Amino acid sequence: MRALLIAVVALALLAGSAGAGSGGDSTVARLRLDGVAVRPELALTSERRARGLMNRRKVPADGMLFVFRQSTSGGFWMKNTLVPLTIVFFDASGKRVRRMSMVPCREDPCAIYDPGRRYRFALELRAGDRRPARKLGPLPALRHLIRQAE
């Protein structure tokens, strides 16, 4: 029984870190998108948010979630991003602000994808992801992520 408990704890710890072959060095979060469990990679620091999914050939299955300590404005660009993406912006309560399609930037100047409203989270997904992405949650988990953001 004790060996089983140790194995379960070890698996839980491993599940919280990004996969070695994914190109990511961030952790993942256990959240819900429209009530369905998702585990996006996290971009909690300014450095990680600036790097995002640049130079990666594969997008994580549940995307990458950019978390901001304060509501912010402004947009994202696709410089050095190799694959097209869908981006969904959410407010602090997890309600969708805007959804946009983004294409890789081949030369300067690169387009800026700006939702036109303030947001607290941005979720980058594979281009064409068909999930409605209307609500991100649960709220206590989102608040915890906001406290972790730098």
Where are these regions (language model features)?
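Positively charged n-region of N-terminal signal peptides that target proteins for export
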Residues: 1-4
